[in-house]
């Protein structure tokens, strides 16, 4: 939990060889002690001293370190989809940050992002037209959010949008453990194609807030460790799955 910020009951039951009922009882005890807050199917670490929200998403540095090898392959595959003359939207996140790094030598493209680290990196490339969403800074993820950020996406016509995920499944689409995350939904109408970039560990992790329904996603790029069950589930949707 310290590393990922959240845990799922079914994962803990497998790790500790205990029943889900026992795990739920333990999480209930920890909630009473003020260590975690529970949600349906799991729990999140309470971040003391942070007024933004009690149940926070994993910080940017922690995200960047997790599953780094698969994320690099995923980012490289995403970069290959971006061609000269394109306009691209990058949502905030560790995998989309790797995409930004992969665009450091790109020429004649436009990148729109709410990610401060991505914007800082891309600002070094004078051959990129960089558009940064305004709004309120969410310090944990170093990204821009709120109504100002969402309004800045109006009248944008991008070729591709890249979005990460805390969790994804074929029924609920992309979900998050963070409250009030709505900017991804504002990005979708501005893009002709929506591409989710996430490592296979994110499959069947379900946050309590939906970011994007599965119907809004055109392509998922993930690593080759994704299960056959998840592949079959996605075959029943309109989503194209790319494994790397």
Language-model features and meaning:
Residues 99-102, 233:
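A short acidic, amphipathic alpha-helical/loop segment
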Residues 96-99, 205-206:
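Short glycine/serine/threonine-rich phosphate/pyrophosphate-binding segments
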Residues 65-69, 73, 94, 106, ...:
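Residues at secondary-structure transition points
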Residues 2-88, 101-105, 112, 123-127:
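HTH-adjacent hinge/linker in prokaryotic transcriptional regulators
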Residues 3-10, 17-19, 32, 38, ...:
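Conserved phosphate- and dinucleotide-binding cores of soluble alpha/beta proteins
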Residues 85, 106-108, 191, 217:
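A general structural motif
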Residues 88-89, 105, 118, 220:
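Structural signal for interior beta-strand "rungs" in well-ordered beta-sheet cores
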